[in-house]
Each structure stands twice: as structure tokens, then as C-alpha cells.
Amino acid sequence: MTTWTQPDPSYTAAGQALARAARPDYFVWLEHVKAAAGCTRPIRLSGLLSTVDATTGRLLNDRHTDGLPDAAIFKACGNRRATVCPSCAQTYQRDAYQLLRAGLVGGKGVPTTVATHPAVFVTLTAPSFGTVHNRIVRKHSCADRRRCDCRAEPCHPRRDTGTCRHEQPAACWARHETGDPLLGQPLCLDCYDHTHQAVFNLFAPELWHRTKQAAERSLRKLCRRRGIPFHPAMSATGKVTYKAPVRLSPGKVAEMQRRGAVHFHAIARLDGVNPDDPADLITPPARIGIDDLIVAFAQAATDIAFTSPAHPDRREGWHIGWGEQVDIRPITMTGNDEVTDAMVAGYLAKYATKSTEATGHTSSRITADTVDDFADPAGDHIARLIDACWHLGRATHIPTPLTGRPVPYPDPGDRLTPFGTPWTCQDCGTRTRYAACPVCVAERQASLDTKPANTSKPHPYTRLRRWAHMLGFGGHFLTKARRYSTTFGALRAARIAYRRHEHNAPTHAYPQAPTSAEHLEPDTTLLIGTLTFAGVGWHTHGDALLANTAAALARARQQAGHEEIAHELGSTITGTQPVAA
């Protein structure tokens, strides 16, 4: 008869948490990891922390991270994907909201006058690559679209319920619910063009770039037709060029549909151009308005299309263009119309933490060792998309091995010496018996050594293997014009400065904790860290449990505070405004 032995408490997360909390330096450790407390996999840094006089450069103090709790400095990973780190993803999402909204109403270094500039909300979708199951609601009666329970229309009704060439049903009469796993799946996997969709995802950023350029060209031509003067500008070579009086400042985000095709939501703001200060954001001319901006983008979305480069599987390339569903709406700053600044910023920031979760596929970068786990030419929809990316991204040119190359042999009677009749080089005057002048060859080779040996551009389809885990899309989630708004780096720097200045007096100070330069007198000392990567993650599951719990409680208090402030503001506004009879 076997007896059960209770495991050591240190082997469980709860036991490790209790052991950590029982230490006398528990609150010191909790304060030390506060900056990365909510992170799932924080980065640990170790090394030397030196305090240096800023004026003389004299070393004042040296401290090693071995004297800190856990002998390391913890830094949040900063990953934007919610499936990887929910805490860092929430921070990224809030930064994205502030960045996008600042480009519409000002703030964060952007003048508030941009609120008077014309702006539109543009949605550009991918074309059809085959019939998929979808959910269409003609008229919503729900209060919240995120919890929509409205009755949907039949998926794909047809008068003649036939089959496709692969003997699959060509109609679907089901009324799909919101969480139906069939949504986004093709009616026939063999009829669906997975290859074309993978190529579209790859070239979608280039298509957006050309669409934006076409809209800008359309606005410039409109300015010429209406007689709006262009601004002369002097180039670096002394040539006078004329700049358009208007400029587009867009910001776009990418969203992955359930079928695995990427489409874009964009904010496009129209700015004027100050010839004396190109970085200045001024109001555009009055003769160019919101209607002209809508027409320019609508025309560009219709006209712009191109053919992808040739591929061995398709010499003529693939057609890259937008789908039929193009939506362009004006944005208002009053908060009373259909599309407002807060709605747009919140809608776009919602996708800040998304990747390919909508398709049901989440994975890290796929390699040759792991591709068989995800790609299958006869598998489901996502497996076929990944297989198409991997197949198209293969090496299309394999050089002949050295052992298989022909070796030229001299004919009988040929001289086997490199020397010939003496001759004089006409370029440098060198007298030589070599077939080529050694002086000129050395100079020419020296100039060639500064250039890459292979000047040919890599095949664009090779990027499909790198981004196979993203179903071919290799662009960033959020891109913007330089003058649209602030940057993520500026928002992070402001947050770090706030934490250091406002929270520089912890309740339980560690006696050997380093003090950064912002905590001292200005312009007196600097804190220089010579740090190296020590690892990723918490030391124990108990540490992760304690740190994440403390961070979750702090976020809950913060959220409750935000809701209370919003409630008080709403009550104040309601109390001051007259109620309609």
C-alpha cells in the first residue's frame, strides 16, 4: 500500500508566494519590481550603476545590481500583443489612443488648431478571393455592438442551390451567430485563392502608400485648377521648386479579418503648408474642404492598382487592388455627429493589441523546423494560407555547385604563362607584360571593394516566409505621417519622467537602491548603467503571482477612479443643463 506524501510547499506557486511574502524585505522587493509588476515576462538586467558628476566627469559612486533584490533590474517587455503580455499591451493601447486623438484635437505637442482642419475616416478592404461565411445584420437593435445579439440575414442564399466544381455546396442558409467558428471560413477550400490572398497581404502596405500618394496628387491638381498659389522653395542644389499649399497627414492601422485578409482603417487630416516653416501645422486654404478630401480618397481607392512582380508560379504576377467595400466618412470634433474624434481614436486603438487572433491562429515566427506544425496544403483555411506563404517564399534561384560547374582546360599548344608581349597602358603609362595593367586593375578593385558584391535586389516574395505567422502581412500595426502627431517614444519618455518625479519617495526605501539623475539636483550628477541581459521572466511562479496581483489591484483602482471621475463629470453636466420637456 502506497502512502501519499505532501509535496514541498516551495514547489507550488502559492508556497513560493508565501515564502516571498514572509521575507523581511518583501515590501522592498515589491517596490523594486513595481515598474514591471504587471508584465508577464519582464526583462532582467544586471551590471554596474555608476554615479558621475555631470560637470567634471568624476566618478562619485559605483554600485552593482548584486546589491538589489533578486540581483537584477526588472524592465517590462513592452510587447503590444495581448496574447503575449496583457499588461504591456494595455499600456500600448492607451498610448495608441492618445497618439491618434492628439492628431485630431491637439495636445501632446500638437497645436489645438488641428481640430479645425478637415479630416476623414477611411476604411479600405481587401478584394474577394472566394466566398466565405459571414454575418450580415441589416438593422441593429442592440445597444452595444460588442455584444450584438441581433437577428442576422442568411449567409449566402441562392435561388438555385447547386454545387461548385469540387462538389461543395455553393449556398449557405444559416444565420450565423457572433461567435460561430464558421465565420470567415470558405464555402469551398479548393475554390478559394489562398495564394492570391497571401500576396495581397504582402503588398498591402505598398498599395496603401500608392493610394495616399494618389490622393495627394489629386489635391495638388485641384489647387492648381482653383488658382491657389504654390509656394516657391529653394532646394539644396539651388533649384527653385514649387510646393503645394496643402499636405496630407494620415495615420492608419491594420486589422486582420476573420478570413485572414488585412484591411486598413485610416485617419487623413488636411494641413496647410507654411513656406517659412515646413514643420508648422496651419489651417489649409478655405477653398479646399472636407468634400474635396473625400473625393480625392474615393478616386484614389478606385483607380490605384498594380501588378505584383513576376513569380515562377505566375509569370504575369497578381493583381493588387482594393475591394469594393470602401467607406469614407468625415470626422467632426463637436461630438454630436455620426463619427467623432473620440470614437475614431478609440476604434483604431482597439486593434493596437491585436494580431491574427481573429482568424483563430496565434503563433510566433515560423521556421523550417516548425512549419509542418502549421502549414498543410490540404488542411483548413489558415493552414493553407501559411502553406501558400511558405511555398511562394521559397528560393527560386539555386546556383550551380562548384563541383558541377565546367572547368575550362587549355588547348594543346597554348601558352600556360600569364605573360605576353610587352605593351604600354594608355591610361597610366605603365609598361607591362600582363594581359591587364596591374596598376589600373588595383585602382579599379579598390573602388569596387567599397561596394557590395551582390547589387541585385532580393526577391520580394522571400519575405512571405518571414511573415508566414502573420499570414503574409509584414507591415506594422500603426503607421503615421511624421507631422500627424507625437511618437510612442515621446509618450514613453513622458511616462518615465512622471514616475520618477511623482513617485520618487517609496514607502519602504531600500538602503542600497540607486538614485537616478532625475531624483537629484538638476545638472549635478548622472546615473550611467553598464547593464547586460540577464534573462527573461520572474525567478519563480510565486514572484509572478505576487507581482501580477499587485499590478492588477493597482489597475482596478485606477479604472475605478476613472469611472468615478467620468460619473462626477456627467452628473455635473447633467445638473447644469436644462432638461427638455
Question: What do these predicted regions represent?
Answer:
Residues 143-193, 304-315:
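Low-complexity, serine/threonine/proline-enriched polar segments
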Residues 70-74, 107-112, 224, 228, ...:
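Catalytic micro-motifs at enzyme active sites that drive phosphoryl/nucleotidyl and oxygen chemistry
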Residues 266-313:
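Helical (often loop-to-helix) elements that flank the catalytic cores of nucleotide-handling enzymes
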Residues 120-125, 187, 350:
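Active-site-flanking beta-strand signature of metal-NTP-handling nucleotidyl enzymes
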Residues 71-117, 127-169:
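Long, contiguous juxta-domain segments that are non-catalytic but functionally important
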Residues 1-84, 90-93, 318, 322-581:
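Long, low-complexity, charged/polar intrinsically disordered accessory regions
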Residues 202-245:
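A short, contiguous, amphipathic alpha-helix enriched in charged residues
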Residues 85, 122, 239-276, 348:
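Histidine-centered divalent-metal-coordination microenvironment in nucleic-acid enzymes
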